């Protein structure tokens, strides 16, 4: 089967098969002390993150050094992204996360900034989210790296930031599940769209090949499964 890039995954290195951009956790706060989640989806994801965190500690390898000591511990042959997720953002940890992020982006194995973005269901105030998101836009531009975006109910605010900065680097909306009309709006604004396991078929069908990415994110599926699913929806064959 054709090799396909998994542009955004939370899988461990051993499960990513060496063809993924692994989201590198900036756990400057223990998951036990992260801001309270406002909805069920966030709460479930937070629980899974805590489970992964404890699993890393028990295994004593992989990302454990980074999680325990905030030092870079990547494996040769793998590539990463790092960003300040709005779910994990709070006044008490914002500066620490930013400093840690700036340090990680100096390593060549980091090939993207993110996931970063805006989320009106997150506990962090929107003003703080905007401040930290803009700082990550600046880091994306400084390092010449694409920005992987998390956006929930904040499209207008996101577009306003894009208009303000006029970024030269690619902005990739990850886990896109919107309607075709929203997809067309974002495509006209220069966005790339990344699709995971769930999305409206008609939306996937509207995105041109050159603006389309695929991802596993938190899915149990492999990227090959995501590719085959997308191929069926788009009516093409996988070589």
Regions from the PLM with identified roles:
Residues 1-239:
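Mid-domain alpha/beta scaffold segments of enzyme catalytic cores
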């Amino acid at each position: 089967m054709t090799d396909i890039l998994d542009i955004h995954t939370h899988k461990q290195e051993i499960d990513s098969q060496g063809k993924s951009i692994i989201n590198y956790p900036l756990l400057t706060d223990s998951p036990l002390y992260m801001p309270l989640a406002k909805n069920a989806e966030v709460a479930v994801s937070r629980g899974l993150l805590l489970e992964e965190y404890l699993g890393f500690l028990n295994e004593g390898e992989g990302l454990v050094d980074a999680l325990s000591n905030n030092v870079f511990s990547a494996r040769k042959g793998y590539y990463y992204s790092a960003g300040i997720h709005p779910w994990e953002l709070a006044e008490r940890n914002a500066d620490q996360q930013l400093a840690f992020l700036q340090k990680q982006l100096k390593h060549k194995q980091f090939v993207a900034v993110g996931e970063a973005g805006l989320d009106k269901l997150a506990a962090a105030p929107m003003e703080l989210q905007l401040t930290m998101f803009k700082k990550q836009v600046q880091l994306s531009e400084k390092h010449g790296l694409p920005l992987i975006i998390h956006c929930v109910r904040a499209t207008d605010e996101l577009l306003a930031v894009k208009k303000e900065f006029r970024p030269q680097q690619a902005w990739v909306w990850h886990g896109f599940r919107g309607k075709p009309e929203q997809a067309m709006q974002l495509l006209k604004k220069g966005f790339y769209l990344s699709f995971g396991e769930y999305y409206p078929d008609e939306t996937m069908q509207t995105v041109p090949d050159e603006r389309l990415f695929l991802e596993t994110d938190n899915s149990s599926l492999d990227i090959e499964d995501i590719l085959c699913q997308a191929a069926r929806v788009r009516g093409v064959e996988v070589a």
